[in-house]
């Protein structure tokens, strides 16, 4: 599983002009599911997302996690993160999980997140989404599990 984590001042996801998920300060996370991913992988990634220290402390050092600052968590599925881009001029998506598996694993991640944390929003799996964000920093990390 790959998760592109971005620290944001605010973020929202629209589908067909309708806002389907939004947060204020927090993390926007684009999630790509790979064929070997399952429930255990989702649990491991959620732990990392909630505890990864990307927010500044009183001295400006990245010492605070999402749990520490009580920010929002916006999870958005993005199968293109799992693309193989090593050769050629066109991405190959053979390294991404099939859609049914991707949806199952992503929805499990969302379920675990909502059970563990009060401020969770999502995009819509498989939809053509417009993602709007104010990238804070910018601070962006690619997490893998």
UniProtKB/Swiss-Prot annotation:
A motif (Gly-cisPro motif, important for rejection of L-amino acids) lies at residues 137-138. Keywords: Cytoplasm, Hydrolase, RNA-binding, tRNA-binding. Its EC number is 3.1.1.96. GO terms for biological process: D-amino acid catabolic process. It catalyses: glycyl-tRNA(Ala) + H2O = tRNA(Ala) + glycine + H(+); a D-aminoacyl-tRNA + H2O = a tRNA + a D-alpha-amino acid + H(+). InterPro entries: Daa-tRNA_deacyls_DTD (IPR003732), DTD-like_sf (IPR023509). One of its GO terms (cellular component) is cytoplasm. Its main location: cytoplasm. GO terms for molecular function: D-tyrosyl-tRNA(Tyr) deacylase activity; Gly-tRNA(Ala) deacylase activity; Ser(Gly)-tRNA(Ala) hydrolase activity; tRNA binding. Gene3D superfamilies: D-tyrosyl-tRNA(Tyr) deacylase. Belongs to the DTD family. A Gly-cisPro motif from one monomer fits into the active site of the other monomer to allow specific chiral rejection of L-amino acids. Homodimer. An aminoacyl-tRNA editing enzyme that deacylates mischarged D-aminoacyl-tRNAs. Also deacylates mischarged glycyl-tRNA(Ala), protecting cells against glycine mischarging by AlaRS. Acts via tRNA-based rather than protein-based catalysis; rejects L-amino acids rather than detecting D-amino acids in the active site. By recycling D-aminoacyl-tRNA to D-amino acids and free tRNA molecules, this enzyme counteracts the toxicity associated with the formation of D-aminoacyl-tRNA entities in vivo and helps enforce protein L-homochirality. This is D-aminoacyl-tRNA deacylase.
């Amino acid at each position: 599983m790959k998760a592109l984590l971005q620290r944001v001042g605010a973020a929202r996801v629209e589908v067909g002009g309708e806002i389907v998920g939004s947060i204020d300060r927090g993390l926007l996370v684009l999630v790509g599911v790979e064929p070997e991913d399952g429930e255990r992988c989702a649990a491991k990634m959620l732990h990392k997302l909630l505890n990864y220290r990307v927010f500044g402390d009183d001295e400006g050092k990245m010492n605070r996690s999402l749990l520490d600052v009580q920010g929002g968590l916006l999870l958005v599925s993005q199968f293109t993160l799992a693309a193989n881009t090593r050769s050629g001029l066109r991405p190959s998506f053979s390294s991404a999980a099939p859609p049914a598996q991707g949806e199952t694993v992503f929805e499990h991640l969302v379920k675990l997140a909502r059970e563990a944390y009060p401020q969770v929003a999502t995009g819509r799996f498989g939809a053509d989404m417009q993602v709007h964000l104010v990238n804070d920093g910018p601070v962006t990390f690619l997490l893998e599990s």
